[in-house]
Amino acid sequence: MVLKNFILSGLVSVVCVGSLQAAEDVDIAATDPTELATKAWVALKAGDHELVSELTTQCFEEFGDDAVRQQKESGEEISKENASSFPELNSVGTCLFILAESLSQQGYDEKCQATLKKLITDFPECHCANKQGYYWKPAMAAEKRLAE
């Protein structure tokens, strides 16, 4: 239980694979998938749920098709050694997790659960790295969250 709470509470401070240093001034015009995910984490940490929604929607619209293709075509298991080869998959999956957390914080539990289920079903192999470089799988965290 302590580990589960630690993982869930610590997720807000993690940064997506290949993340860039986030500036204080979040510019939604970013077109790099990892930058969008990083900025979405920053917005979530700041409690800016409207910006989380905008950034995650932009990520889905611009990179969703590529993420689906990467998930389907990744005949190999994605691991920490090759995770950076799948930036769209990692960013879209991570953005789903961020969006679910934002929805939960706003009290939209049913939407949160639906978003977590979509992450588990559509992007089970996405990876994310924390600031220390340790990888975790948002889909696994989503499964734990749904089991609560």
Regions found by a protein language model. Give the residues of each.
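Residue signature of alpha-solenoid helical repeat architecture, marking inter-repeat boundaries
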Residues: 28-31, 85-86, 90-92, 137
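Alpha-helical junction/boundary sensor with strong preference for TPR arrays
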Residues: 62-70, 122-130
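Acidic, Ser/Thr- and Gly/Pro-rich intrinsically disordered linkers and low-complexity segments
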Residues: 66-87, 132
